[in-house]
């Protein structure tokens, strides 16, 4: 394997002069307070080695990256039946598009846009009170990362609850089309809390390692999903994981990944490693500007792109 420490150090050196680029997600008041002049990156390999640079131990709001973990839970509960509620195609529209949802009769295009993630959350809630569903997700992520210190930032959750008007509209559209089984306020309460998960790059890379290792976490010995399901979650991340910037990310980076407006990106090099990068400044489609640049550098310097070196 390439000398990952040297490669990661070289990426950090090249990124450092640009730290602060992009614009923080100011439409969520708590995220607007985050200092954009931060950058961290962590790599966890399938043989258990951990590499990190910069602010890799600072917890940040993972936001939409949480959708990967919620999707994993939902597939565990209902399997392929999930795809009656949500599609598997790239959206080509903004992550919070209302027009597309109405045009497609309340069936969200994929589980990683906001409407799709809200539908997935509704599935996970079956038989649970909202507080129980939030607890289930938190326990699951702690189990994946083998880290009981992971928390949900209640200030961020409240901030989203107070300003998430488009998400309220999306949920009401789906409820009108009978694609939500639970009351809108209950589903959104869970959704806003899942997006407020607070994790560091290292914690996030550890939690997602099962997707790099055929569904099992080699560091903990935990079997999480089947190899087939891991492969399919990775496929969805590659095609849909970066909103309407997914094609561009595949073109430049060539790895399955999921971004969040907190500035994080989680990525997978199948059979090799899981990667998490964080830089709060976003590009025009809501993905971490320097996070994407750093991952492009990583793919180029390691040859890890799924499309070849």
UniProtKB/Swiss-Prot annotation:
Q: Which NCBIfam families match?
A: Gln_ase (TIGR03814), PRK00971.1-1 (NF002132), PRK00971.1-2 (NF002133)
Mind listing the GO molecular function terms for this protein? glutaminase activity
Q: Does the keyword Hydrolase apply?
A: yes
Enzyme Commission no: 3.5.1.2
Q: What class of enzyme is it?
A: hydrolase
For biological process, the GO terms are: glutamate biosynthetic process; glutamine catabolic process
> Hey, which family's this protein in?
Belongs to the glutaminase family.
Presence of keyword Hydrolase: yes
Kindly state the subunit structure of this protein: Homotetramer.
Q: Which UniProt keywords apply?
A: Hydrolase
Instruction: Write down the chemical reaction(s) this protein catalyses.
Output: L-glutamine + H2O = L-glutamate + NH4(+)
**Classification via InterPro entries:** Beta-lactam/transpept-like, Glutaminase
Q: Where does substrate bind?
A: 64, 114, 160, 167, 191, 243, 261
Tell me which domain of life the UniProt entry assigns to the organism this sequence originates from: Bacteria
The protein's name is Glutaminase
């Amino acid at each position: 394997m390439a000398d990952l420490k040297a490669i990661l150090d070289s990426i950090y050196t090249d990124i450092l002069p640009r730290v602060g680029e992009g614009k923080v997600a100011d439409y969520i008041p708590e995220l607007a307070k985050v200092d954009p002049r931060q950058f961290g990156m962590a790599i966890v390999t399938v043989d258990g080695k951990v590499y990190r640079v910069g602010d890799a131990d600072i917890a940040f709001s993972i936001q939409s990256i949480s959708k990967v973990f919620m999707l994993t839970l939902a597939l565990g509960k209902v399997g392929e039946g999930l795809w009656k509620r949500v599609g598997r195609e790239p959206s080509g529209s903004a992550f919070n598009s209302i027009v597309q949802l109405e045009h497609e009769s309340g069936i969200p295009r994929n589980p990683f846009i906001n409407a799709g993630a809200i539908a997935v959350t509704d599935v996970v809630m079956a038989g649970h009170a909202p507080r129980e569903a939030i607890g289930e997700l938190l326990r699951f992520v702690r189990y994946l990362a083998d880290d009981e210190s992971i928390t949900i930032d209640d200030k961020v959750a409240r901030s989203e609850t107070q300003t998430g008007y488009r998400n309220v509209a999306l949920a009401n559209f789906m409820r009108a089309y009978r694609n939500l089984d639970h009351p809108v306020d209950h589903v959104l309460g869970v959704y806003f809390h899942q997006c407020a998960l607070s994790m560091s790059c290292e914690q996030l890379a550890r939690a997602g390692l099962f997707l790099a290792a055929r569904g099992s976490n080699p560091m903990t010995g935990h079997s999480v999903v089947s190899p087939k399901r891991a492969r399919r979650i990775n496929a969805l991340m590659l095609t849909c994981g970066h909103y309407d910037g997914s094609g561009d990310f595949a073109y430049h980076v060539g790895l399955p990944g999921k971004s969040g407006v907190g500035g994080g990106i989680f990525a997978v090099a199948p059979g090799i490693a899981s990667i998490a990068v964080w830089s709060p400044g976003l590009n025009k489609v809501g993905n971490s500007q320097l996070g994407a640049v750093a991952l492009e550098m990583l793919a180029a310097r390691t040859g890890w792109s799924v499309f070849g070196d």
